[in-house]
């Protein structure tokens, strides 16, 4: 028995020694727990750290999409919405980022690499891809999950949250963007985003959020000599 145990130990050591070292790879979702939602949520919280389009933005998009759909009495597939909301901006982060392509298209193409093995129902992956691909306000969503994610994401560019997100991008060392360029981004959002909110409930949210952003820009210009001292 001792000899057999010794041989097993030696063989195990040799096998372990012969295994090649794992190559450096992009971070992947952890092994599947009982609840795949927790896996995806934890993955997003760990990997997506950014003041404008990080984990907290994904949380807001998910919650607001559900609110808007409920207000419109529309039933959503929560599996599709949850996965799309928490992973829609993954290609804005390294190592998934591709500066030559729209981050929406890149994320839609690779989102399965995160969801596989988590317990997510992969038969729904195409719906997740579609919602991610059209989440930006300048794209046209198809299907309820895509529509309400699109509108939630658009509304997050307006109001006080929209201001906070854009101003968080300002380089504290005077790089790009500076304060005036951030203001230009806010003005562009004010001009372009409202008309692209498409759902009835979403459109109902536009006016007060637009007014908040307009008020901020008006006050900022007044208090900075029309941005000259910003």
PLM features: residue spans?
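Short glycine- and acidic-rich boundary segments immediately preceding or forming the N-terminal edge
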Residues: 40-43
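Divalent metal-dependent phosphate-bond-processing catalytic cores, especially two-metal-ion Mg2+/Mn2+ enzymes
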Residues: 30, 35, 46-59, 63-75, ...
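Boundary at the C-terminal end of the N-terminal hydrophobic targeting segment
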Residues: 18-24
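An active-site-proximal "capping" alpha-helix that borders the catalytic cofactor pocket
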Residues: 61, 102-117
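Acidic/histidine metal-binding catalytic segments
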Residues: 74-83, 118-131, 145
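His-Asp-centered metal-binding catalytic motifs of divalent-metal-dependent phosphohydrolases/nucleases
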Residues: 78-97, 103, 107, 128-138
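Bacterial N-terminal signal peptides
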Residues: 4-16
């Amino acid at each position: 028995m001792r000899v057999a145990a010794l041989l097993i130990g030696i063989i195990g050591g040799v096998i372990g020694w012969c295994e090649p070292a794992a190559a450096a790879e992009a971070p992947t979702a952890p092994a599947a727990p009982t609840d795949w939602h927790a896996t995806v949520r934890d993955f997003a919280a760990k990997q997506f750290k950014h003041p404008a389009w990080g984990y907290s933005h994904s949380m807001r998009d998910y919650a607001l999409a559900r609110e808007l759909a409920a207000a419109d009495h529309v039933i959503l597939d929560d599996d599709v919405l949850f996965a799309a909301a928490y992973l829609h901006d993954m290609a804005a982060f390294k190592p998934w980022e591709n500066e030559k392509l729209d981050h929406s298209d890149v994320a839609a193409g690779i989102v399965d690499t995160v969801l596989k093995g988590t317990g997510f129902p992969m038969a729904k992956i195409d719906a997740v891809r579609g919602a991610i691909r059209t989440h930006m306000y300048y794209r046209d969503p198809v299907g309820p999950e895509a529509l309400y994610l699109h509108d939630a994401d658009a509304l997050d560019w307006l109001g006080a949250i929209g201001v906070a997100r854009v101003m968080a991008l300002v380089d504290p060392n005077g790089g790009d963007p500076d304060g005036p360029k951030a203001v230009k981004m806010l003005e562009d959002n004010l001009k372009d985003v409202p008309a692209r909110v498409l759902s009835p409930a979403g459109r109902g949210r536009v006016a007060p959020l637009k007014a908040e952003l307009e008020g901020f820009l008006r006050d900022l210009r007044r208090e900075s000599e029309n941005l000259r001292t910003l």
